[in-house]
């Protein structure tokens, strides 16, 4: 978040009046354009921070419904089969059918929630302009091209006027303008790549979550039919195994897809932004120090009168590094709190592993006992499988609920202290707009 400093302190004595006025006008245009480009990055960060303000509850609701449905199925299955291990014919199949219907309903709700997120993302990418990364990137690069042309025009103007070209102050000013340009581009680069990574990861996860819930619903439907046609049991358990495998892999695959897309975005942007490779904040501060040294040797009183304004605006640059770290840390933290249990790598591995175990136990026990009508031993295995289901779904419900509560507490705490990402960004935008107003007041 760049910026900026009032640099219109070129002495009229160094050049003819026309060249001086043209230089001041160019400085104003360059600085205001840099400010506007800086706000572009802030707006994209703000959109990322606010993006899931309400939609996160669709995630939470869908995942909780999905897990709750199978929790009901596991509890009823354990009750019916566990209490009738030695009397298999007393198992109430109608109760099991109703329980599996609950499981199907929950997974359908979960799949619908994730599908709705994909749909809303698609609609949002069409109608949203301000925070849409693709549109923002296109506009940023277009405006950056114009900024670079103005900087180049300024360099040519300075080079063609002997007085301007010999001024240490103006040379230092030019270095700082270049450094500010790189700082703004680097900020945009980091923001764009982060937002792209997060959005691609989310989209891939939603797609896989639709698949996870769909295969779970199919498995429940086939298992329901297998109560009356036992030879369908292997097919039902295979669907559960697929669902479990997707549950385990989804967070890893989605985060991997985001990182790959991020690398592509980084490579593409690095070429377009033409960054110097200097540590940007440190380079800006070094250029500012050099400019201040040049100011000390300046004899023109009109320039010295502008120095306090320079010092006030300098605070924006000097606070840039720490603020950028706080904002990015805040965005990452918000992303962490927004993750449901199925998006948490270790929680999803535990949950998916248990569903995978359910399918494996179900298939193995059917092949060994069920198809040979050794029902008592088969019931013991099925009871164990249902207990595993209860454990998995309870973990899913608990981990998702914990993430939701932690996120809401962090939001409430940040709102009270006015230290949320949104608050930091809003304050920064106001500061930049204030500096922009000061720049526009300067007359050559």
Regions found by a protein language model. Give the residues of each.
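Classical Sec-dependent N-terminal signal peptides that target proteins to the secretory pathway
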Residues: 1-17
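Leu/Val/Ala/Ile-rich N-terminal alpha-helices, chiefly Sec-type signal peptides and the beginnings
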Residues: 16-111, 117, 124, 170-207, ...
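Cytosolic/matrix-facing juxtamembrane and C-terminal tails of multi-pass cellular membrane proteins
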Residues: 19-33, 37, 133-160, 264-340, ...
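Membrane-proximal, non-transmembrane alpha-helical segments
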Residues: 39-47, 170-200, 307-344, 348, ...
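Membrane-active amphipathic alpha-helices enriched in small hydrophobic residues
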Residues: 57-82, 98-126, 197-225, 235-264, ...
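A structural signal for well-ordered alpha-helices, especially hydrophobic packing surfaces
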Residues: 69-72, 113-116, 120, 148-162, ...
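Interhelical loop segments of eukaryotic multi-pass membrane proteins
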Residues: 86-91, 133-137, 228-234, 270-271, ...
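Surface-exposed, polar helix/loop patches in the mature regions of secreted/periplasmic/lumenal proteins
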Residues: 123-135
């Amino acid at each position: 978040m760049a910026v900026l400093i009032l640099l219109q302190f070129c002495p009229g004595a160094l050049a003819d009046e026309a060249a001086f006025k043209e230089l001041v006008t160019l400085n104003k245009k360059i600085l205001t354009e840099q400010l506007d480009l800086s706000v572009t990055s802030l707006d994209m960060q703000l959109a990322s921070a606010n993006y899931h303000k309400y939609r996160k509850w669709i995630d939470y609701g869908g995942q909780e419904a999905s897990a709750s449905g199978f929790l009901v199925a596991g509890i009823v299955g354990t009750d019916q089969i566990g209490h009738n291990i030695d009397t298999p014919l007393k198992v109430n199949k109608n109760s099991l059918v109703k329980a599996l219907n609950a499981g199907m309903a929950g997974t359908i709700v979960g799949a619908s929630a994730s599908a709705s997120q994909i749909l809303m993302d698609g609609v949002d990418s069409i109608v949203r302009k301000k925070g849409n990364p693709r549109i923002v990137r296109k506009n940023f690069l277009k405006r950056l091209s114009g900024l670079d042309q103005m900087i180049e025009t300024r360099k040519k103007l300075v080079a063609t006027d002997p007085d301007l070209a010999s001024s240490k102050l103006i040379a230092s000013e030019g270095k700082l303008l270049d450094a500010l340009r790189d700082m703004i581009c680097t900020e945009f680069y980091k923001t764009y790549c982060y937002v792209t990574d997060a959005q691609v990861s989310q989209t891939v996860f939603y797609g896989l979550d639709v698949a996870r819930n769909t295969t779970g619903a199919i498995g429940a439907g086939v298992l329901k039919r297998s109560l009356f046609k036992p030879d369908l049991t292997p097919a039902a358990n295979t669907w559960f195994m697929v669902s479990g495998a997707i549950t385990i892999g989804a967070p890893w695959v989605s985060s991997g897809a985001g990182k790959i897309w991020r690398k592509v975005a980084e490579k593409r942007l690095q070429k377009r932004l033409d960054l110097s490779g200097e540590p940007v904040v440190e380079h800006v501060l070094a250029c500012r120090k050099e400019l201040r040294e040049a100011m000390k040797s300046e004899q023109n009183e009109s320039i010295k009168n502008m120095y306090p304004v320079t010092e006030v605006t300098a605070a924006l640059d000097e606070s840039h590094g720490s603020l950028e770290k706080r904002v990015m840390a805040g965005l990452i933290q918000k992303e962490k709190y927004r993750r449901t249990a199925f998006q948490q790598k270790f929680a999803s591995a535990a949950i998916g592993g248990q569903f995978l175990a359910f399918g494996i136990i179900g298939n193995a026990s059917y092949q060994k006992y069920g198809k040979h009508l050794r029902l008592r031993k088969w019931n013991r295995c099925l009871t164990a499988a249902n207990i595993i289901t209860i454990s998995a779904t309870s973990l899913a419900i608990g981990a998702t609920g914990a993430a939701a509560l932690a996120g809401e507490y962090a939001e409430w705490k940040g709102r009270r202290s006015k230290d949320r990402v949104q608050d930091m960004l809003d304050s920064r935008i106001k500061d930049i707009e204030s500096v922009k107003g000061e720049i526009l007041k300067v007359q050559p």
